[in-house]
Amino acid sequence: MRYDQEAGSSSHSLPSGSSSHSLPPTEDTPLLGPRTLSSQPKTFANVFIAIVGAGVLGLPYTFKKTGWLLGLLTLLFVSSLTFFCMMLLVHTRRKLESLSGFNSITSFGDLGESVCGPAGRLVVDVMLVLSQSGFCVSYLIFVATTMANLLSRGTEHILGLDAASIYLWGCFPFQLGLNSIPSLTHLAPLSIFADIVDVAATLVVMVQDVFIFLKRRPPLRVFGGVSVFFYGLGVAVYAFEGIGMVLPLELEAKYKDKFGRALGLAMGLISIMYGAFGLLGYMAYGEETKDIITTNLGTGVVSTLVQLGLAINLFFTFPLMMQPVYEVVERRLCSSRYSVWVRWATVLVVTLVALLVPNFADFLSLVGSSVCVVLGFVLPSLFHLQAFKNELSITRIVVDVLVFLIGVMIAITGTWTAVHEILTSKA
């Protein structure tokens, strides 16, 4: 997942006659400058790029816990509900703009403020900061674990730190430098590199999984039990997280009446890819499937290149994903002024959290079950219900309330399950 995938907390307009260079970049400032309206194929591609990210790497381990059939059903349920809630945001924005007569709602935060006032924007801001920071914590865990797996063949400790912790701290000074850059325009090509590596690595891993399965054929579980259902929901929600980018993507679509079709097609294709990746990974390694599937690949040339490529990808994606966090924090604490000390302190906090998390997939489930569920299910249904409260039929009110309650239930139960898994792993 990239920086522009999650941007969407607030919007800022330029005064007339001013240049885009006269103001610091914000979370919804395009990395590559102004863009023309997107055609239908480009809209589809943008949606695909905005959603596919590092969460897919934890799906095989999740299938090991949930069982392969329950894992597939969970992915189908989450993708369908995510698509429904994305369209709720689009319909809510269109409704509010039809009442005002102005196209002033360009982000999730704008929508929250339009529906619920400053409190709505505050809630979106907080959820955005937590989700983006959570994504970056998982990135650091992946990078450190991958480097330790490739370069450290023992259980040696230095100054009481294991190999993964040493590599994590080794990333810290470089991340301070990267995150000190006020404008990330020069890092934009890395975003393209990230997308290419993600897709290529996914395909390579899936092909290897097929050959390994044909050789080993390990026993597989169909259902892992009800107790792990909410754990799987959390990881799936994390993997499909991208709702913060829906409104900007719909705004730049040339054929807005066909946006839902492009969004649905992209979600369907991503669901198939995620299901195949999770299933093949679990089929290849069975109960030996690790929390980061790439660590199962061994030390061959191809597997090493895949792991290094993904690690480098996420290392340089880190500052892009943190940009919305800096926009929110600097806007609220520093009157939107650039502050290197705020950025460094934020990177330090994210690094410390990464040190405390023992398992990659468990942390994905925690982030997905908590903040991603609130952003993806709870807030869209709440905003839609509030905006259309005087027009909805009883059936539609029941649907919105049901989605809201499902989101709250997943958030509470899934968070508890993920925390329990993390504490159990830590013990």
Curated annotation (Swiss-Prot):
Residues 64-69, 144-157, 208-227, 284-300, 361-362, 418-427 are vacuolar. Keywords: Amino-acid transport, Membrane, Transmembrane, Transmembrane helix, Transport, Vacuole. It is a multi-pass membrane protein. It comes from Arabidopsis thaliana (Mouse-ear cress). The chain crosses the membrane at residues 43-63, 70-90, 123-143, 158-178, 187-207, 228-248, 263-283, 301-321, 340-360, 363-383, 397-417. Coiled coil: none annotated. Residues 1-42, 91-122, 179-186, 249-262, 322-339, 384-396 are cytoplasmic. Residues 1-35 are annotated as: Disordered. This is Amino acid transporter AVT3A. InterPro entries: AA_transpt_TM. It is found in: Vacuole membrane. Its main location: membrane. Belongs to the amino acid/polyamine transporter 2 family. Amino acid/auxin permease (AAAP) (TC 2.A.18.8) subfamily. Signal peptide: none annotated. Translocates preferentially neutral amino acids and to a lesser extent aromatic amino acids from the vacuole to the cytoplasm. Requires ATP for function. Residues 8-24 have a biased composition (Low complexity). Ubiquitous. It comes from the Eukaryota. GO terms for cellular component: vacuolar membrane. GO terms for biological process: aromatic amino acid transport; neutral amino acid transport. One of its GO terms (molecular function) is aromatic amino acid transmembrane transporter activity.
